[in-house]
UniProtKB/Swiss-Prot annotation:
Region (Disordered): 236-260
CDD domains given in the database record: SAM_PNT-FLI-1
Encoding gene, per UniProt annotation: Fli1
Entry-annotated residues carrying Phosphoserine: S39
Disorder association: Involved in erythroleukemia induction by Friend murine leukemia virus (F-MULV).
Organism: Mus musculus (Mouse)
Tissue specificity remark: Expressed in both hematopoietic and nonhematopoietic tissues.
Record's protein name: Friend leukemia integration 1 transcription factor
């Protein structure tokens, strides 16, 4: 019976794998797989060949992995991983529809993300550089910040018809006109962080490939890391200390940058200027004396390193100034009126919009400490000024011009012999010179004698 079947198969087919036992073991596994898969044409020999017809698939290691995955699928044509469906069909089937599936998979991989992904938020993300924002970008950013951080009581009409350049020019006082102090810190901090992040992105991508595919792959992760890092800093920064200048700690390298200590920077200058020397201390010097020591921060403290300070307890400052000047009735009203005297002298100014806040002008202080022009002449010619009174006192002592002319001794030379030289000299003869004849030493002693 078996011999009859082999003979019949040898007549209708030239493929030895159908009747030769030597090929049975090699073809057993593909036959079982294809039978289990329920294919209607599994018996055709050209459908069983596991090798792809194209040469480019032979040397790729992906064929082995996909083949193993295919062997363990238990006859199923659907892979448990979506990204493996097209690869498996490409290697096994060899049909015309399979290359289309593979190409569609690659297009889907390199194309934009679907709407239901978490990166859908990128559709409302504005350009990285806030100075390039349009009015619509400013509106989107403001709406996003309100929803993201739960900000309330913001006058959105204040930001209408405002582009990115105008937004970046706003300072803290401008934001306070549209919202509260807390919202101002949040908006200013995030705006400053975006500007620094744009500089970081420009520096890292200026010498790299700018293709669109790299941008699609890198932008979602960069945006998520940037927003996550800023959120962490906001949660820690707003609970610890107020932000200075709209930027808390983020630098160009996304590392925390500590704020400089104003007491270390301004401390030596404050101590030097606060020392009045032998004279009485002035009010502005007294304030610098308090600011030179951080232990006085409970009543007066620096606000940054630009000379701005604030009286946290103005009554205590006035009380200490009253003790120094022995004025027990001193209060802040009297002290503030005394401070106005320094405005015209450019020693300090009042910070507008802030209570009990002032700012020292160190350049004006340096000019105020310069010696007066009349005082400089006292030190420019000290010998001449000290010489003249001594010279006249010397004349009175030696009685150079007596009351009676007869008492004046007469020498062999005429006393007025050199009168013409005396009055025609360049110095008008105010001081004696060697050309004028002198009397004996008993009457006109030398000016360098015992009287000096």
């Amino acid at each position: 019976m078996d011999g009859t079947i082999k003979e019949a198969l040898s007549v209708v087919s030239d493929d030895q794998s159908l009747f030769d036992s030597a090929y049975g073991a090699a073809a057993h596994l593909p036959k079982a797989d294809m039978t289990a898969s329920g294919s209607p044409d599994y018996g055709q020999p050209h459908k069983i060949n596991p090798l792809p017809p194209q040469q480019e698939w032979i040397n790729q290691p992906v064929r082995v992995n996909v083949k193993r995955e295919y062997d363990h699928m238990n006859g199923s044509r659907e892979s448990p991983v979506d990204c493996s469906v097209s690869k498996c069909n490409k290697l096994v089937g060899g049909g015309e529809a399979n290359p289309m599936n593979y190409n569609s998979y690659m297009d889907e991989k390199n194309g934009p993300p679907p709407p239901n992904m978490t990166t859908n938020e990128r559709r409302v993300i504005v350009p990285a550089d806030p100075t390039l924002w349009t009015q619509e970008h400013v509106r989107q950013w403001l709406e996003w910040a309100i929803k993201e951080y739960g900000l309330m009581e913001i006058d959105t009409s204040f930001f209408q018809n405002m582009d990115g350049k105008e937004l970046c020019k706003m300072n803290k006082e401008d934001f306070l006109r549209a919202t509260s102090a807390y919202n101002t810190e949040v908006l200013l901090s995030h705006l400053s962080y975006l500007r620094e992040s744009s500089l970081l992105a420009y520096n890292t991508t200026s010498h790299t490939d700018q293709s669109s595919r790299l941008n699609v792959k890198e932008d979602p992760s960069y945006d998520s890391v940037r927003r996550g890092a800023w959120n962490n800093n906001m949660n820690s920064g707003l609970n610890k200390s107020p932000l200075l200048g709209g930027s808390q700690t983020m630098g160009k390298n996304t590392e925390q940058r500590p704020q400089p200590d104003p007491y270390q920077i301004l401390g030596p200058t404050s101590s030097r200027l606060a020392n009045p020397g032998s004279g009485q201390i002035q009010l502005w010097q007294f304030l610098l004396e308090l600011l030179s020591d951080s232990a006085n921060a409970s009543c007066i403290t620096w606000e940054g390193t630009n000379g701005e300070f604030k009286m946290t307890d103005p009554d205590e400052v006035a009380r200490r100034w009253g003790e120094r000047k022995s004025k027990p009735n001193m209060n802040y009203d009297k002290l503030s009126r005394a401070l106005r005297y320094y405005y015209d002298k450019n020693i300090m100014t009042k910070v507008h919009g802030k209570r009990y806040a002032y700012k020292f002008d160190f350049h004006g202080i340096a000019q105020a400490l310069q010696p007066h022009p009349t005082e400089t002449s006292m030190y420019k010619y000290p010998s001449d000024i000290s010489y003249m009174p001594s010279y006249h006192a010397h004349q009175q002592k030696v009685n150079f011009v007596p009351s009676h002319p007869s008492s004046m001794p007469v020498t062999s030379s005429s006393f007025f012999g050199a009168a013409s030289q005396y009055w025609t000299s360049p110095t008008a003869g105010i001081y004696p010179n060697p050309s004028v004849p002198r009397h004996p030493n008993t009457h006109v002693p030398s000016h360098l004698g015992s009287y000096y």
